[in-house]
Every structure is written in C-alpha cells, then in structure tokens.
C-alpha cells in the first residue's frame, strides 16, 4: 500500500500533471490512505487551491482510519467557504461512524457541537445516524432531546436513535479484570437468516456471509494494551479469515482447522484514552461458497 502511495505522490508532485488529472490523482490518494499520503493531503486542505481541496474532500470519507477527523472538524467549524465546509462535513460523518481512536464519549460531544452548526437536513439526519451507533448516557440524552423536537422528521430520527442507543447501553461491558471475556450471547449481532446465538452453547452460528458481524460496546476505565483472542470452532466445510477491530486498530486471523472450540490469537491492541469503544468481529473471506465462517463463542481481552 505504501509503495503505491509513493508512486501516486511522485506523479502528483514531480510530474505536475494538468489540473484535471491532478484532481483525479488527489482523489485516488485519498482512497488509498497512509500516513505519508495524509500529511500531503492535509497541507493541500490548508492551502488556497479550492479545486484541489474539493478533490481531496471527495475521497476522505473512505479513509481507512480516523486520521483526518481533527482537520475535518476544524474545517467544519472555521472554514469560510460554504461549499468546502459542507464537503468537510460529508467526509467527516462517515469517518466518525467508523472505528477510530475517538471514544464514544468524544464522538458524542462532537456530534452535539456540529449538529448546531448550520447544515442541510440530510447532513443532520446522517449525524443522528452516527449518534445511534454510540453507547453513552450523553448520547441517550441528546437523542431524547431530538425526539422531543417540533420538527416531525427530526423527532422520528431522534426516537429511532434513542431506541438504538438504549439497546447499545444495555450491552456495555466494563473492563474490570486482567482477563475479560466477552460472550457472543451478550453481543449486538448484525446479519440475516440463521446468523444468531445458539442457546445450547451460547455461540453465534450460521455465519454464511463474510459481511455479517458482531459488536460489543466496551468501557475501558483507563488506557492500556490488550492481547485479543477468540474462542471458536470451525463447522464442517467452513473456515476462512476474519478481522477484529478495537479503537481503530485491526487484527486479522484465520479460523482453526478443526471443529472443536479453541482459542485463536488475533494480536495486541492499544486503547490510548479511557472511554467506550466497540470491539467488532467481521468476516473477510469464507473458504467455501456454501460453507460457514465459524461458530464464535467468545472474545477474550487480556491486559498486558
């Protein structure tokens, strides 16, 4: 990835393509991501070339981590050009909804602040959509205040967000010990058909689509590093790759080659600030078209 970014940057900086091609390259760089790429794009956003700034903003909503959030937030609050400001908000919202270094508490405060800034109804609706993903008491209070608005559309979105945040809060796990086990039966389960908790052993089964996923809202009272492993079995004809996400960090692992429950190490994850974050497990690939990824019983966070 970084090598591809270097080549794109070389063409952009050294060969100086004409404006139309330059804008296309800026958009490509925005989709690819990477620390060096972001440093270049950030300088463009701080500059005066309006067309180049727009080209960068068009792709930042798909950035692979939360690196652009602070810069985009500053643009939303202080940019004088209304088009640039609106584009920054439309890039900021999907990034805010994705896992990142920002805790749910920080995301809640950001949504409350930005919601009051003049923006379109669709932009406000999208912000409420992000609010519905969170698991904080402040998010619940803000959703409740939106549900009480005279604007019927805002009120309906606020009511939906209130219900979602209430459900999220009911699932919050608070880290207390060196060894913390998140049971699949306590997760928020997102999928279709038979993808659900099996009451006989408490595992989630029916993982027939790699896009299915589970979420645990977890409150970390302090910063720290954690080794994460999953306890799972591979059903006959199944198996594949999966991803674990926490606080914007990602780890990829493969299922075991047997149908017995066993622990699968994923990697070390760092929580840099106290707060509530989501542990997310999603599929990447399933080895056989008609197979199932795994039967997932639990996730373990071990402090180190």
Regions found by a protein language model. Give the residues of each.
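Extracytoplasmic
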Residues: 165-304
């Amino acid at each position: 990835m970084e090598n591809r970014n270097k080549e794109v940057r070389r063409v952009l900086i050294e060969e100086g393509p004409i404006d139309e091609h330059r804008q296309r390259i800026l958009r490509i760089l925005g989709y690819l991501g990477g620390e060096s790429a972001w440093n270049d794009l950030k300088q463009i956003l701080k500059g005066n070339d309006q067309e180049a700034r727009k080209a960068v903003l068009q792709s930042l909503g798909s950035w692979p981590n939360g690196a652009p959030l602070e810069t985009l937030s500053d643009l939303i609050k202080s940019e004088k050009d209304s088009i640039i400001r609106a584009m920054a908000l439309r890039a900021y919202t999907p990034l805010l909804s994705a896992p990142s270094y920002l805790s749910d508490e920080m995301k809640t405060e950001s949504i409350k602040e930005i919601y009051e800034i003049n923006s379109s109804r669709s932009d406000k609706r999208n912000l409420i959509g992000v609010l519905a993903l969170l698991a904080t008491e402040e998010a619940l209070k803000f959703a409740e205040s939106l549900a009480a608005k005279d604007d019927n559309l805002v009120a309906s979105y606020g009511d939906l967000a209130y219900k979602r945040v209430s459900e999220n809060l009911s699932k919050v796990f608070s880290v207390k010990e060196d060894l913390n086990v998140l049971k699949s039966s306590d997760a928020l389960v997102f999928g279709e058909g038979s993808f659900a908790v099996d009451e006989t052993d408490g595992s989630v089964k029916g993982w027939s689509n790699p896009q299915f996923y589970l979420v645990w809202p977890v409150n970390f009272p302090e910063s720290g590093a954690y080794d994460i492993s999953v306890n799972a079995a591979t059903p006959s004809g199944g198996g594949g790759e999966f991803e674990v996400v926490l606080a914007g960090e990602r780890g990829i692992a493969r299922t075991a080659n047997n149908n017995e429950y066993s622990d699968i190490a994923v990697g070390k994850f760092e929580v840099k600030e106290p707060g509530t974050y989501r542990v997310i497990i999603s599929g990447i690939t399933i080895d056989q078209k008609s197979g199932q990824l795994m039967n997932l019983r639990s996730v373990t966070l071990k402090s180190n």
